[in-house]
Design a protein with these regions (language model features):
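Internal/C-terminal transmembrane anchor helices
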Residues: 40-65
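Terminal, low-structured helical/coil segments at or just beyond the last alpha-helical repeat
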Residues: 252-253, 312-365
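Alpha-helical transmembrane segments
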Residues: 15, 44-51, 158, 194
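Intrinsically disordered, low-complexity segments enriched in Gly and acidic/Ser/Thr residues
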Residues: 276-323
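Soluble catalytic regions of membrane-associated enzymes that act on cell-envelope
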Residues: 59-240, 247, 255-274
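Extended alpha-helical scaffold regions
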Residues: 31-43, 156, 162, 187
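Membrane-embedded alpha-helical segments of integral membrane proteins
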Residues: 1-37
Length: 365
């Protein structure tokens, strides 16, 4: 099933109710099998209709749609309300792979990828990007992730496939992405084609008309978001598909532009989720050489690496690890085996070393 099954997710209460209700209902039916409670046929019909109505109302009011959260996040993403995705996930956790992909994307969009990644259950590559997407939502979110990490051509391809596979080859949301990608790559005639299509739709007309001035190459080059995307365009030929070979495709992007923050964060997030600390430390050495600041998540992983994988005090001291992070890690090492699991999770559940020690490593796709 595409819906999450993860050690950190509690078993839903509804499953327990179903298991308890089945023997109870069977016992009641056996007990009343030969009894007659209502003799008039008219009353029998009324009672049956009332019970049917109650069942229908209960089904409508208390149903749990497994895709509800994913569609909610898809709606927020369409409006660009990324903070609402993060806030909802904090309040209700995450119940679906597509929802988790949107959540991780929202963390990247809001600049909280490194600070909040370990606050939510991670399931591996399937939580970062859909694998070989075919559905409308899969293609949309794959295009969103590719756009975020700077692989513009991949974002364009996913959007184009989504448009072709939609009814009457019309999918305004993906057409907007096609306009954006064509503007970034300087294919102005292709961009104008989709601008014309969107201008014929009253709902998207204003947005499409606002893009028309960007069909001029000079105006386009001076637009901030386009300049930012062009600055991160791949330099070397990158034939790898993000949805099939995610870490390798990201490595190409990082090698081309070390300052591509979203691609770097996704790449480091992938390595940490799969507990590949050796490869992770290769990138940490490069960060150290560039004199960059280390997020707390990376500091925690570095502490774990030098404590459990390669004990080298001198090398450890060469990294800018804050005293607070070191003290918390030492406290964790001291109480990890003696503290009750619930208390340990409450105190250290948002740290990388807790994840590495107690959460099973996802299987690679």
């Amino acid at each position: 099933s595409k819906h999450l099954c993860h050690p950190e997710y509690p078993i839903p209460n509804s499953l327990g109710y179903i298991m308890l209700a089945y023997p109870l209902i069977a016992f009641i039916l056996y007990y009343v099998r030969s009894r007659v409670f209502i003799r008039k046929e008219s009353w029998k019909r009324i009672v049956s209709y009332v019970f049917l109505l109650i069942a229908m109302v209960a089904g409508i009011l208390y149903k749990k749609d497994p895709m509800e959260q994913a569609y909610r996040y898809d709606y927020y993403a369409r409006l660009g309300e990324w903070q609402k995705i993060v806030s909802h996930a904090r309040a209700h956790s995450v119940r679906d792979m597509d929802a988790l992909i949107y959540l991780n994307l929202a963390l990247s969009k809001t600049g909280r990828f490194t600070s909040d990644l370990m606050r939510f259950p991670q399931i591996g590559e399937g939580g970062f990007i859909p694998h070989d997407p075919k559905s409308r939502m899969g293609l949309i979110v794959a295009s969103e992730v590719a756009w975020q990490v700077g692989q513009v051509n991949a974002a364009q391809r996913f959007a184009f496939v989504g448009v072709l596979s939609s009814q009457r080859c019309v999918q305004p949301r993906l057409m907007k992405r096609l306009v954006e990608t064509y503007l970034v790559t300087g294919e102005y005639r292709a961009a104008e084609k989709y601008i014309k299509i969107l201008e014929s739709n009253p709902h998207y007309r204003d947005w499409a008309t606002a893009q028309r001035p960007l069909l001029d190459s000079v105006a386009c080059a001076s637009e901030d978001w386009i300049a930012a995307k062009r600055a991160m365009l791949p330099i070397t030929d990158n034939p790898l598909d993000l949805t099939l070979i995610f870490p390798n495709a990201l490595a190409f992007l990082i090698d081309d532009h070390a300052d591509n923050r979203p691609a770097f964060e996704y790449g480091m997030g992938y390595l940490l989720v799969y507990k590949d600390l050796m490869t992770f430390m290769h990138y940490m050495e490069l960060m150290k050489e560039r004199g960059e600041a280390f997020p707390v998540l990376y500091q925690e992983a570095i502490c774990l690496f030098f404590a459990a994988v390669q004990k080298d005090p001198e090398a450890f001291r060469s990294f800018p690890i804050s005293q607070e992070v070191q003290n918390r890690f030492l406290q964790f090492m001291k109480v990890a085996r003696s503290m009750p699991p619930a208390a340990l999770k409450q105190q250290f559940g948002d740290t990388y070393y807790y994840y590495a020690q107690f959460i099973p490593t996802p299987k690679r796709q």
